[in-house]
């Protein structure tokens, strides 16, 4: 093996792309800040039992585990920042009984990539709201997610909506056990209505519930899906409430293209209600995902309503606006000491000043000039 090789699905970020990422990160955090979201920076590594909440079984497959040489205990390298933020809200910020608005932007590490085209070291950015159960909180986060996509230069974005509460309500009413519910959830993802129908028939479910489960994979499309669902799904209060929430989101974004899929249920995840995602042209999967995950903080001692979204900023590199490097001022190496005061003054003003040792450099070809002493004063002389 060559010493310069990196593991599969791991890559360096070179200067041009690094400038793009850092510029976008700064703009995103500024956007979050003016909406009231405070930055938190959880550690890259924690005790494994804190990272693996046992709510999301899929997370354990993504998490890289190591042994702590200090304590002998098992540590995990984070694969998702959301459980860490839930811990912070539940424990470190527990003095606030009201709403906590929190945001983050940092690397995570996956034991396996999410797909053949995905990296194992995403730069996960996101925003989360704790302590507010009303649909208005979800609408606020969706609005922030869509604004984030504008910063990432995603162009026209399609907003996809779902609601796991509908499936849960039907499962409870049909008295499905945990194993049956998990099986049906997995089948729903493939939209194989034939297999779903065969499965509910094998379980000998009551006809009303069997029909409802078979119908869910067919309930997808535009805003009209909601009225269709109201007329065809069983009249359960939880189902009606979920449809009301979806309608409220649709009404809040009248100019946004919306796709509704009532069988988009995200297997092996911690979401409990409304689900939302953003899709953009030329991306094979959602560019951002979010939803409600009430009670996640209960694992850390304080169950609270919660909603939020996140995305991998590194996956946007090909679409991020170009961040040009500032033209540099050169100063000859033999003049550097004598010009030190002038050099530092320029740098304090934000000007890039590079010492020219005469053997080439990696600064922009478009130079701002060269620092020369003219009439006893150090000045930038244009080329």
From Swiss-Prot:
Pathway(s) served: Amino-acid biosynthesis; L-histidine biosynthesis; L-histidine from 5-phospho-alpha-D-ribose 1-diphosphate: step 1/9
GO cellular-component term (any): cytoplasm
Keyword Cytoplasm listed: yes
Subcellular location, record wording: Cytoplasm
GO MF entry, a single one: histidine-tRNA ligase activity
UniProt KW Amino-acid biosynthesis keyword: yes
Alphabetical UniProt keywords: Amino-acid biosynthesis, Cytoplasm, Histidine biosynthesis
Role: Required for the first step of histidine biosynthesis. May allow the feedback regulation of ATP phosphoribosyltransferase activity by histidine.
Family to which the UniProt record says this protein belongs: Belongs to the class-II aminoacyl-tRNA synthetase family. HisZ subfamily.
Primary location recorded for the protein, binned into one broad class: cytoplasm
Miscellaneous information on this protein: This function is generally fulfilled by the C-terminal part of HisG, which is missing in some bacteria such as this one.
NCBIfam families according to UniProt: PRK12292.1-1, PRK12421.1
Classification via InterPro entries: aa-tRNA-synth_II/BPL/LPL (IPR045864), HisRS-like_core (IPR041715), HisRS/HisZ (IPR004516), HisZ (IPR004517)
Protein's name in the database: ATP phosphoribosyltransferase regulatory subunit
Known partners and oligomeric status: Heteromultimer composed of HisG and HisZ subunits.
Protein's GO biological process: histidyl-tRNA aminoacylation; L-histidine biosynthetic process
